[in-house]
């Protein structure tokens, strides 16, 4: 059975777009429709993931790949530590003293 709700919604939206000439109303309707499509798509993807009948095939490559994969939420910045220490001792956010800078010969 085909779900007729999206078709009905599309017909109503097209009718409103034809009869309405205001841009703000049109943009509101378009944003509501896109939100509905995004939410509906995410919901169906989640349903598909929760489906017990379609078990994903596992092999050693995918298991080792998923085991070796690191999360993208935390990026280590240890390589930046020496530069930050140098900048901290050199610039205003550290203990910068303009009078401790070497004076060039011949500079007035």
UniProtKB/Swiss-Prot annotation:
Induction: Expressed in the late phase of the viral replicative cycle.
Alphabetic keyword roster: Glycoprotein, Late protein, Membrane, Transmembrane, Transmembrane helix, Virion
Region (Disordered): 49-69
Location relative to the cell: Virion membrane
TM stretches of this protein: 10-32
Family that this chain belongs to: Belongs to the asfivirus H108R family.
Protein name as annotated: Inner membrane protein H108R
Gene source species: African swine fever virus (isolate Tick/South Africa/Pretoriuskop Pr4/1996) (ASFV)
């Amino acid at each position: 059975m085909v779900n007729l709700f999206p078709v009905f919604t599309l017909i109503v939206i097209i009718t409103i777009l034809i009869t309405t000439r205001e841009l703000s109303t049109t943009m509101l309707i378009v944003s509501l429709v896109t939100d509905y499509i995004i939410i509906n798509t995410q919901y169906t993807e989640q349903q598909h993931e929760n489906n017990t009948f379609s078990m994903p095939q596992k092999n050693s490559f995918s298991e080792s790949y998923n085991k070796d994969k690191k999360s993208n939420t935390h990026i280590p910045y240890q390589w930046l530590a020496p530069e930050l220490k140098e900048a901290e001792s050199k610039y205003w956010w550290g203990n910068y003293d303009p009078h401790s800078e070497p004076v060039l010969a011949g500079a007035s």
